[in-house]
């Protein structure tokens, strides 16, 4: 999955609109390339009509960088890029200054000094000594020594919890901001790299150095220092926990024993509501009322209010000079503390007071994953509308009534976060407390109903959050309604974005509260992407919110900015069936084109959501249901005439738009007006996934012509010569080479276990493990011939391709793989090379120098330009090499810059469980621990599986003549399925047994150019032709690899008790001497017996009964109620080996050999056990037979098992490979086989000839055939749908190269007749 796809998923949700507009910049690059292509075609003139317009790399004369139109677009791109840089840098600086202010405030607070003695540290923050507070001991007042009252342990626990909360919150904020800067820096780097690659500029390095590297967000050093300071403080706080816990337990014992210490007496007086006694006790403690610390009075007032001790409240209000404590760590007054206490529901039971240790243990375990959790709330809340809080209004109401006038401003006082008590009541959903506060402000004439409660200038805190924002984030609909009820109903609110936030929270009641206020439009579109709240709900599968919005009349036809997608596009593409059904039931239009020319039906079908594509299927427009990309089925559409315009960009989440969106950018499709209304924009990215860009052609013109005029300019019309389908022969493994394919995680999409899982890190070890920053995974193989490790950013993307290493061939597969956890930006391969040279990490390789720094690190990694990242350039590297000694000292000072944080090691020869020679486990993910480099503790685990591809050696192994793969495939053809067709449980027509010699010969004689059959391996390693994984003819289910060839060919035959020829002939030979399957020999004996008794009429019926009874308990018979190639259902024939088939079938008949190797879910469905033949051995055995007997015959390999296909591609260059996919007709756990889209990606990556898809997605959406063709792949279909000549013709008109059918004769005749009729016209 590309960076653009995952970029939004790694963003801090509340800051989403502050990131670089990556999609928009990417689309601007696409627009530049389209102009360059057009200029190139114009320059080539008529020659461009004979082939695709393809500019050759980065030749300046082909980039047209001096052309006015290109210069104009480049200027617009850099202008937009500069604005994004300013936006990111400005936001980053503003947030950093705020967090820095909070941290410095904390470091100078009395509470922190009371908890732990923080000395002058080594970081930049502890640059000055902290104020000396005497927490426990003597202090002087007016020159006289006085005993200072030590803080109550409970107060200490509250201070500790408060300090801890601030530290963890700041730590989270700094980490989020660090990730924000790193992610944007990564985005700028990638977009500049893309500009250089696509447009041909050379701006990446210079632009980064001049415009990005000098900015604050590109240098995380201050944030690293801040995090180091926080970790240092947390390290010092941790030892205090046990001491404080002991003190709490001691106080609990004193309370139970009726202790009479002054502090305990004050607490008991508050509980008894003895106000007068409380004041007297305080006077006795502090000698005078004026000497009682304000902090003590505020704390006692809060305790009295929480205890409903109104007498104590009144007494304290009479003597307290102010409600705010100047030394308060957060600058909060009584009202702040009281509202927060109500929100957190802090009671004073002994059990809950004893939970400080659990609080710390819960809070001090820090997640090591880098990006913030997408659904993490910005602030804490304890259930909707304070359901778990103490929303008790009586104490606060009493205090507000008794509050002296000079203390009333405290209700609007702001703390260090610029929040008033109203902010906190909204945050915790205390709707009654909110009502009391607003009512009091109204009575005091301190409330202006004409000021919107979401006015940031008036109510915004330090992060521009108002009480309304906090109530929405906390999902408090009643609190929202309470806030809005005190506003002027005619006053409009200013934050329509809150509607989208409420939608993401999936709260219909919250949406209802917001929509009841003026200023919230249900159809509001966000300016950046024009997405409505309904679109967000449909895109994220938020059903309840979507249902509410639809029922409230939300416009379902408003398109977003990028491709004009309406909500039904988003839901259909993601496969959200409930959402699609909801939209269809309420009248949403689905006969629409997006800006790239595709319908929701086609998007769903491409991605394997066939149930959805049936639900929104378009049946009344021939431009969609019967496209004609080739008017003669005997002639194919050339790959150069493919839908390049429709495939030139990625999915909407990967591309962007810079144009202003219209209210509805999707075109309505009706039978009478579709051709006129449908048009593809001249410069637009596409909404269909890009598979590749091998063909830059004129197919966009062809498609537009076909949709507008119903006629396509075909090969015959243009008189173009036939072009190769694919270059003949591809790179393959030499006899001394192997390939290792590592799949991080697993290809089983049912697994929810991440590939890399890092443990929670205790705060005490955070500074030593250093897992609190952006991390990457460095995968290295010691034997890698390219000496290039692979760097992958964490968290790993979904659907990540395999990591590939080419290594020397070792018979025992004794390869070692290292998985290193390193800082994303603090680690460089230059450091790794230095470590190698010093013997620290010898596994990584010994390449040195700038060329190595700029190495391509693998197909799945990214090119490591350290100069881009503001770290190392070739010059600085040379200089550093000359001063290695000083650099080593610097490494010690800043160990993070060159440190491997953790490592896991896999020995591939012993990693999987041994299950016998030439056998393997079908599915076995390997799990290994990650060991910390310093502590040697387990930091987490890595889960992966692997495949080692060994070379195939044969005397005939060579690249054939320089022609084409399957060169005769320039005309659409019919392929016989399992010969003349697979057997079915019907008596409508006579059937030849499938996968038999007779069936293959019959198919060839009736016009099939190729015959398709299934090959499996027996126990004694002989390839045989058989379809089912389980052999059921014996009456029991036996996997093929558990039967020898002799057992298979003579299956269920009576054991020869005598060796004489007469008995052998009678029991096992037919009159013509051919070898029979047991079905035939048994049938002969039974038939003869019945005929001798005169029961000829019952013969057929009895045979069916006999064979049915024999196999009635097998899985195959239970599933299908019959068995293929069995007497009674077909003309049964003998089984055959692959070698025999080469000898018996005419040379002119091509073979489509399907390699029948089970996938994980197939093995589970058939219950064949977890053991299979080792794949290298399986394929080598089959290839051996093919190369020994091919003798010029056309041969194609195909398989549903993706690993078999890629292995066949890597082992030999002579025969093309087709990847079989069910295209969503059946659910497959292997992500590569889950959809037509993934099949195309897989086939293109491994240089396969094409795909063989189930016909269903192509029948539903015929234009998808051009998606396959545009990727340079052959498109073949199979399935019962192909037996209908009319449907087969539709597929071929759409560009399908071949159809695999059961009714060869009928389909061939139907197609021929239509072709002849077309010629006569």
Swiss-Prot record:
Subcellular location: Cytoplasm
Keyword terms: ANK repeat, Cytoplasm, Hydrolase, Repeat
Reaction catalysis annotation: sn-glycerol 3-phosphocholine + H2O = sn-glycerol 3-phosphate + choline + H(+)
Record protein name field: Glycerophosphocholine phosphodiesterase GDE1
Cysteine disulfide links: none
EC id: 3.1.4.2
Compositionally biased intervals (Low complexity): 651-668
Gene (name only): GDE1
CC per GO annotation: cytoplasm
Upper classification of the organism: Eukaryota, Fungi, Dikarya, Ascomycota, Saccharomycotina
Keyword presence, Nucleotidyltransferase: no
Gene3D superfamilies: Ankyrin repeat-containing domain, Phosphatidylinositol (PI) phosphodiesterase
């Amino acid at each position: 999955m590309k960076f653009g796809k995952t970029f939004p998923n790694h963003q801090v949700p509340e800051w989403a609109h502050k990131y670089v507009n990556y999609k928009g910049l990417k689309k601007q690059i696409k627009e530049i390339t389209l102009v360059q292509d057009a200029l190139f075609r114009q320059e080539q003139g008529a020659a461009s009509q004979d082939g695709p317009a393809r500019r050759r790399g980065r030749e300046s004369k082909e980039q047209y960088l001096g052309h006015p139109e290109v210069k104009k677009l480049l200027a617009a791109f850099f202008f937009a890029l500069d604005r994004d840089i300013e936006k990111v840098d400005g936001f980053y600086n503003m947030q950093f200054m705020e967090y820095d202010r909070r941290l410095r405030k904390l470091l100078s607070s009395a509470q922190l000094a009371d908890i732990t003695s923080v000395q002058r540290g080594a970081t930049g923050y502890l640059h000055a000594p902290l104020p000396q507070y005497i927490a426990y001991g003597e202090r002087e007042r007016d020159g006289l020594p006085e005993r200072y009252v030590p803080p109550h342990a409970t107060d200490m626990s509250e201070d500790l919890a408060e300090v801890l909360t601030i530290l963890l919150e700041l730590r989270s904020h700094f980490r989020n901001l660090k990730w924000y800067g790193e992610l944007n820096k990564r985005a700028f780097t990638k977009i500049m790299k893309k500009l250089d690659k696509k447009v041909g500029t050379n701006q990446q390095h210079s632009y980064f150095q001049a415009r990005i590297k000098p900015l604050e967000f590109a240098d995380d050093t201050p944030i690293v220092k801040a995090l180091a300071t926080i970790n240092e403080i947390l390290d010092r706080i941790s030892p205090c926990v046990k001491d404080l816990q002991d003190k709490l337990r001691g106080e609990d014992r004193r309370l139970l024993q009726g202790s009479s210490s002054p502090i305990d007496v004050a607490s008991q007086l508050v509980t008894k509501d003895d106000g007068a006694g409380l004041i007297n006790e305080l006077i006795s403690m502090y000698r005078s009322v004026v000497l009682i610390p304000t902090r003590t009075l505020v704390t006692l007032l809060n305790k009295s209010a929480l205890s409903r001790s109104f007498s104590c409240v009144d007494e304290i209000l009479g003597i307290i000079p102010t409600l705010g404590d100047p030394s308060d760590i957060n600058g909060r007054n009584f009202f702040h503390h009281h509202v927060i206490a109500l929100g957190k529901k802090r009671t004073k039971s002994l059990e809950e007071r004893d939970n400080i240790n659990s609080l710390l243990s819960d809070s001090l375990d820090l997640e090591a994953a880098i990006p913030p959790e997408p659904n993490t709330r910005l602030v804490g809340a304890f259930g909707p509308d304070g359901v778990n809080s103490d929303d008790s209004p009586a104490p606060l109401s009493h205090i507000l009534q008794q509050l002296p006038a000079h203390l009333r401003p405290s209700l609007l006082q702001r703390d260090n976060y610029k929040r008033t008590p109203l902010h906190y009541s909204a945050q915790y959903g205390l709707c009654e407390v909110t009502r009391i506060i607003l009512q009091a402000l109204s009575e005091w004439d301190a409330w202006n109903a004409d000021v919107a409660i979401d006015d940031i200038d008036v109510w915004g805190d330090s992060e521009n959050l108002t009480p309304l924002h906090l109530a929405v984030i906390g999902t408090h609909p009643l609190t929202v309604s309470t806030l809005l009820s005190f506003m002027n109903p005619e006053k409009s609110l200013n934050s329509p974005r809150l509607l989208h936030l409420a939608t993401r929270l999936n709260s219909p009641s919250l949406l209802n509260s917001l929509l009841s206020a003026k200023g919230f439009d249900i159809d509001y579109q966000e300016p950046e992407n024009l997405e409505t709240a309904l679109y967000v709900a449909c895109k994220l599968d938020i059903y309840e919110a979507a249902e509410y919005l639809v029922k409230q009349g939300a416009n379902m036809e408003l398109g977003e900015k990028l491709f004009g997608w309406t909500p039904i596009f988003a839901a259909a593409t993601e496969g959200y069936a409930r959402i699609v059904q909801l939209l269809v039931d309420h009248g949403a239009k689905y006969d629409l084109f997006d800006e790239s020319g595709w319908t929701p039906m086609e998007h769903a079908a491409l991605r394997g959501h066939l149930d959805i594509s049936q639900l929104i299927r378009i049946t009344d427009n021939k431009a969609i249901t019967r496209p004609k990309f080739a008017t003669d089925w005997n002639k194919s559409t050339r790959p150069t005439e493919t839908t390049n315009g429709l495939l030139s960009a990625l999915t909407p989440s990967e591309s962007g738009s810079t144009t202003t969106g219209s209210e509805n950018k999707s075109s309505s499709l009706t039978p009478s007006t579709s051709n006129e209304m449908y048009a593809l924009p001249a410069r637009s990215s596409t909404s269909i996934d890009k598979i590749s860009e091998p063909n830059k052609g004129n197919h966009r013109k062809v498609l537009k012509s076909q949709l507008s005029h119903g006629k396509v300019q075909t090969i015959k019309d243009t008189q173009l010569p036939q072009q190769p389908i694919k270059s003949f022969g591809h790179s393959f493994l030499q006899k001394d080479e192997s390939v290792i394919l590592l799949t991080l995680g697993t290809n089983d999409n049912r697994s929810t276990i991440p590939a890399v899982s890092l443990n929670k890190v205790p705060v005490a070890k955070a500074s030593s493990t250093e897992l609190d920053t952006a991390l990457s995974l460095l995968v290295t193989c010691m034997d890698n011939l390219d000496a290039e490790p692979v760097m992958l950013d964490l968290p790993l993307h979904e659907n990540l391709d395999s990591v590939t290493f080419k290594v020397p061939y070792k018979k025992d597969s004794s390869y070692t793989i290292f998985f290193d956890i390193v800082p994303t930006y603090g680690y460089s391969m230059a450091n790794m090379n230095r470590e190698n040279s010093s013997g620290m990490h010898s596994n990584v390789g010994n390449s040195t120098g700038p060329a190595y720094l700029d190495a391509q690190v693998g197909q799945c990694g990214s090119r490591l330009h350290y100069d881009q990242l503001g770290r190392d350039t070739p010059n600085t590297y040379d200089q550093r090499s000359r001063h290695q000694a000083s650099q080593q000292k610097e490494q010690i000072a800043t160990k993070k810059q060159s440190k491997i944080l953790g490592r896991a090691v896999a020995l591939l020869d012993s990693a999987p469980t041994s299950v016998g020679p030439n056998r393997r486990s079908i599915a076995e993910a390997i799990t290994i621990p990650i060991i910390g480099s310093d502590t040697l503790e387990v930091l987490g685990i890595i889960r992966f599986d692997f495949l080692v591809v060994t070379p195939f050696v044969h005397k005939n192994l060579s690249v054939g003549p320089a022609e084409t793969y399957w060169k005769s495939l320039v005309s659409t053809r019919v392929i016989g399925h399992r010969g003349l067709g697979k057997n079915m449980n019907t008596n409508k027509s006579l059937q030849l047994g499938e996968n038999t010699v007779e069936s293959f010969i019959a198919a060839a004689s009736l016009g099939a150019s190729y015959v398709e059959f299934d090959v499996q391996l027996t126990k004694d390693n002989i390839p045989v032709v058989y379809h089912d994984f389980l052999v059921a003819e014996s009456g029991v289910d036996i996997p093929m690899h558990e039967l020898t060839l002799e057992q298979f060919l003579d299956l269920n035959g009576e054991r020869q008790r005598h060796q004489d020829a007469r008995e052998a002939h009678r029991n096992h030979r037919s009159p013509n001497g051919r070898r029979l399957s047991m079905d035939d020999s048994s049938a002969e004996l039974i038939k003869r017996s019945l005929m001798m008794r005169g029961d000829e009429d019952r013969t057929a019926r009895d045979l069916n009964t006999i064979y049915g009874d024999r196999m009635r308990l097998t899985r195959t018979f239970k599933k299908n109620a019959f068995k293929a190639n069995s007497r009674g259902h077909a003309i049964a024939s003998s089984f055959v080996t692959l070698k025999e088939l080469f000898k018996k079938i005419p040379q002119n008949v091509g073979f489509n050999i399907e390699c029948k190797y089970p996938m994980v879910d197939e093995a589970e469905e058939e219950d064949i056990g977890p053991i299979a033949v080792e794949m290298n051995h399986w394929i080598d055995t089959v290839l051996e037979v093919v190369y020994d007997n091919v003798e010029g015959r056309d041969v194609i390999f195909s398989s549903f098992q993706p690993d078999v296909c890629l292995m066949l591609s890597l082992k030999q260059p002579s025969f093309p490979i087709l990847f079989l996919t069910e295209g969503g007709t059946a659910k497959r756990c292997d992500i590569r086989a889950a959809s037509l889209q993934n099949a195309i990606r897989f086939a293109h990556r491994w240089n396969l000839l094409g795909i063989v898809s189930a016909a269903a997605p192509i029948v539903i959406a015929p234009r998808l055939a051009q998606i396959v063709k545009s990727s340079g792949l052959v498109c073949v279909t199979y399935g019962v749908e192909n037996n209908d000549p009319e449907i087969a013709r539709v597929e071929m008109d759409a560009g399908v190269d071949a159809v695999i059918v059961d009714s060869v004769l009928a389909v061939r005749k139907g197609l021929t007749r239509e072709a002849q009729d077309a010629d006569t016209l």
